[in-house]
Design a protein with these regions (language model features):
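Vicinal oxygen chelate
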Residues: 1-6, 26-130, 140-152
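Conserved beta-strand-loop-alpha-helix junction that forms the acyl-donor binding cleft
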Residues: 9-11
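Conserved active-site tyrosine of GNAT-family acetyltransferases
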Residues: 15, 19-20, 87, 131-134
Length: 152
């Protein structure tokens, strides 16, 4: 199973510049007549469609800015600090400053790297930024799993 989000954007060129320069996505292909692009970054695939362009639409309500309310996209990267530096240099809006954050895991899990039997935390070095249309992205580096800190 592969999940490939398609995001409506106001200006395809501005969005392509942002995704290529800040988040290092590469353009796999474009359908210029439809104002559409298909992007990829280390196995993560993403589609962009210009909202006012002639392409096909899947909407349940009028589109209002900022787009993407109620969702953020978490993107695992090798060097979150480099992504943060590019974000600052680009002038993109940083919503949550870079941080190390540990999240509690309340239940036992046994799947893949998640071998959790007691009170545990999973950590990220992360920040949240907004793309030109207001979609929120959370680049992060996985800090691993540790026993929960009972002093918190």
């Amino acid at each position: 199973v592969v999940l490939v989000p398609e995001l409506d954007v106001r200006a395809l060129e501005a969005s392509l510049h942002f995704y290529a320069e800040v988040l290092e996505f590469r353009i796999l292909f474009e359908r210029s007549a439809e104002r559409f692009a298909y992007l990829e970054h280390d196995g993560v695939e993403l589609m962009l469609q210009e909202a006012a362009g002639p392409g096909r639409r899947f909407r349940t309500a009028p589109l209002e800015s900022p787009y993407g309310r109620g969702v953020n996209f978490q993107l695992c990267v090798a060097d979150v600090d480099a992504v943060h530096t590019r974000t600052v240099s680009s002038g993109a809006k940083i919503v949550v400053p870079i941080e190390e954050r540990w999240y509690p895991i309340d239940v036992a899990v046994s799947a893949g790297r998640w071998q959790v039997t007691g009170p545990t935390e999973v950590g990220n070095r992360q920040f949240v930024l907004a793309d030109p249309d207001g979609y929120l992205w959370r680049p992060f580096r996985d800090l691993g799993i540790r026993p929960a800190d009972d002093s918190a």
